[in-house]
Amino acid sequence: MDRRDMTISAWRQQLQSGEVSSRELVDQHLKRLESSEPSLNAFVEVTADQARAEASRIDEARAAGEALGPLAGLPLAIKDNLCTKGVRTTCSSRMLEQFVPPYESTVTERLWQAGGVLVGKTNLDEFAMGGSTETSAFGATQNPWNTAHVPGGSSGGSAAAVAAGSCVASLGSDTGGSIRQPASFCGVVGLKPTYGRVSRWGLVAFASSLDQVGPFAGSVADVAELLQVIAGPDPRDSTCLDAAVPVFSDGLSQSIKGLKVGLIKECFDAEGLDPEVKASVQASAAQLEALGAELVEVSCPRFNDGIATYYVIAPSEASANLARYDGVKYGFRAEDAESLAAMTARSRAEAFGAEVQRRILIGTYALSAGYVDAYYKKAQQVRTLIRRDFDAAFKSVDVLLTPTAPSTAFKAGAHADDPLAMYLADLLTIPVNLAGLPAISVPCGFSAAGLPIGMQLIGNVLDEPRLLQVAHQYEQAAQVFASRPEAALVP
């Protein structure tokens, strides 16, 4: 069996049986990481020595008969906007290039308590603002399927690392599609949970009412396992829901016969939707129908208003969140400034990249006294209407289905001079964040050029179990997940 296609449960069985040790497993993934990294640039920081030491400690604990967590010995990667105690957290920005957090984020703390082993921090668009992982201060990440193409963003490093086999699974964050779009582009599974299902404590904030942490993995079952570990209430995050955490893997094997799957009309009629993507997702919908699901066309009339709404709300929240970076307490500080005001202005001008500066300016404008009613408040009203459209749709269906992205991974640099084209790549994912719903991207095919295509399934609030059930049943029937970008990997 090709070990790059193995699931968390299969690795766990081999670790428990002694067929492979945690140290051997970590070494295998580090070897693959080191071989693929020159062509991918998926990592900002590789923690090889720390990973090997932790893996050896877990092997000793296993040999001593100690109880171990469900992820014991498994090599994991973390998006570099999640704080990791003692390990740099840069947000791929010059502003935080030397920042080493004195504390651990809730989600990473839960991963380490479950036995996970950190192999590195992954590259992202600066402060998670982008859709291609090209705005990183540490260089762009490439797509493992074709290194002339982008991996998506902003969690492109996390998606590329899983696709390349540099780790068993990874974490990302999703503000407008930043888990699902890279998952689609890189041919892996990516889940954005319900807003508040997973703690944001220790996630460096971009847009606080939209940000959500979620997992990438090679299969739906693996994503369910990771969600089981990171989900749940957190008193340190007031937006984290005090909701019971179900066993997400319990219903994976159940038939979807009789479930109603809604195909959102506005998504399949969207301007700019690649015909190959549309055909692949429609064929996947037909496969769900063959499994016993009932397909229903539904309408979300304000779905296409999501882009305009998002690009008022998200930059507005970003301009407030990023105001803390002033060159005083931490982060980059410009030298030889003639005054405090000049130091702050120069620190931001020198340390923030062009896209981050653009979004701060948009947000500051939208929140200014003369325009807050016309832009920000109106955007919040439209956001409510978008959520009501979803509420209406879920009265007649169990899950919703769309393409994840309008196209396959585009070529590196293709949208460098056209921010609007870059923003439109999130057309099909953004409304889900505005509504706070859970959604998953599952590989559903390939283009003629050999690039992955993703299908997005959207669930109702806190209905991740149903979402994962449908995704798993499709995945098992389609077997698309078994493919890997072999050309980008070492044997």
Swiss-Prot record:
GO cellular component terms, A-Z: glutamyl-tRNA(Gln) amidotransferase complex
Keyword Protein biosynthesis applies: yes
Any GO BP annotation: translation
One GO MF term attached to the UniProt entry: glutaminyl-tRNA synthase (glutamine-hydrolyzing) activity
Gene3D superfamilies: Amidase signature (AS) domain (3.90.1300.10)
Residues at the active site: K79 (charge relay system), S154 (charge relay system), S178 (acyl-ester intermediate)
Family, per entry: Belongs to the amidase family. GatA subfamily.
Protein name, UniProt field: Glutamyl-tRNA(Gln) amidotransferase subunit A
Organism: Synechococcus sp. (strain CC9605)
